[in-house]
């Protein structure tokens, strides 16, 4: 490829990202949510609780298992809210019904019709920013934890014990903390700001822009990082999106690709993982 073609391609991509930034700032961020059910109450004094937030996407079953496992194993007062970024209205209705069933908050996020196809990471990132700035920032929580919709707690966990010697909790992805298991004290976030968008210039996925807020120049070896151990349901298939999951910090199970956005075919995998979760829940009844 000639130098001129590379320059033109680079400029085209730069223009796309600039346009996305403009629309996000002046259009998306100013939109009202499409629907709210018992959303987080804003204002008031800081309380001893953790705001747990999840961006759901086209899968209601994982949301219900996440609620059940958190209520069983999360050993600190928390408020849990589902921020629905689903593109399938039927799935959104199912997720809302589950939230009503379990009496947890639900917010249907604004549409993102301005995003080109293939910008799922950007979609997730601006959804995370929207939920934090609109609902969490002034919600009065002592801690904030952001979860992927297909991650489940499978053993006792106390968020208040994670910050004795450091300011964050989570797994390192590249040069930042993965936003699927991401937690900090609220006063730290409010001091430095937060940005969960991916970064074109850093070649980073969702959450990469937080590098500039928290992690630039950090000596990672001085901090405890959540271990991410890959496990497979069948030895004959090493595709983690179709046949595997991660065990994180010995107490979190991350499914990978639960909504099958990669088109791998995950029905068998998810049924087996749900069976594993049922066993965990029964053992502690």
Predicted regions and their residues:
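N-proximal low-complexity "stem/linker" segments adjacent to membrane-targeting elements
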Residues: 2-68
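C-terminal catalytic/acceptor-binding lobe
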Residues: 6-11, 15-27, 205-285
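Short, acidic, metal-binding catalytic loop of nucleotide-sugar glycosyltransferases
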Residues: 68-78
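A short, amphipathic alpha-helix embedded in the catalytic core of nucleotide-handling enzymes
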Residues: 70, 131, 159-163
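Acidic ATP/Mg2+-coordinating residue in the GHKL
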Residues: 84-86
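Active-site-proximal specificity loops/subdomain of glycosyltransferases
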Residues: 88-141
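Conserved catalytic core of nucleotide-sugar-dependent glycosyltransferases
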Residues: 121, 151-216
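Short beta-strand-to-loop acidic/aromatic patch adjacent to the donor-nucleotide binding site
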Residues: 140-152
């Amino acid at each position: 490829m000639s130098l001129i073609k590379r320059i033109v391609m680079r400029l085209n991509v730069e223009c796309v990202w600039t346009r996305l930034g403009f629309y996000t700032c002046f259009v998306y961020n100013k939109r009202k949510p499409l629907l709210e059910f018992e959303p987080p109450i804003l204002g008031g004094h800081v309380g001893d609780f953790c705001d747990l937030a999840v961006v759901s996407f086209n899968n209601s079953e994982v949301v219900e298992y996440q609620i059940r496992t958190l209520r069983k194993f999360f050993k600190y007062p928390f408020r849990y809210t589902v921020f629905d970024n689903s593109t399938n209205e039927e799935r959104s209705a199912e997720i809302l019904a589950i939230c009503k069933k379990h009496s947890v908050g639900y917010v249907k996020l604004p549409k993102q019709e301005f995003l080109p196809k293939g910008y799922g990471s950007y979609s997730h990132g601006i959804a995370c920013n929207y939920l934090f700035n609109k609902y969490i920032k002034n919600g009065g929580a002592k801690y904030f934890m952001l979860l992927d919709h297909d991650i489940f707690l499978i053993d006792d966990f106390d968020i208040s014990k994670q910050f004795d010697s450091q300011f964050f909790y989570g797994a390192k992805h590249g040069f930042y903390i993965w936003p699927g298991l991401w937690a900090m004290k609220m006063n730290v976030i409010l001091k430095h700001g937060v940005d969960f968008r991916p970064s074109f210039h850093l070649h980073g996925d969702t959450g990469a822009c937080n590098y500039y807020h928290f992690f630039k120049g950090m000596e990672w070896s001085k901090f405890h990082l959540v271990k991410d151990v890959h496990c497979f349901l069948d030895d004959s298939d090493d595709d983690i999106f179709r046949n595997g999951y991660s065990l994180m910090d010995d107490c979190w199970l991350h499914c990978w690709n639960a909504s099958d956005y990669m088109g791998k075919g995950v029905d068998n995998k998810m049924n087996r993982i749900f069976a594993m979760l049922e066993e965990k829940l029964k053992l502690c009844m």
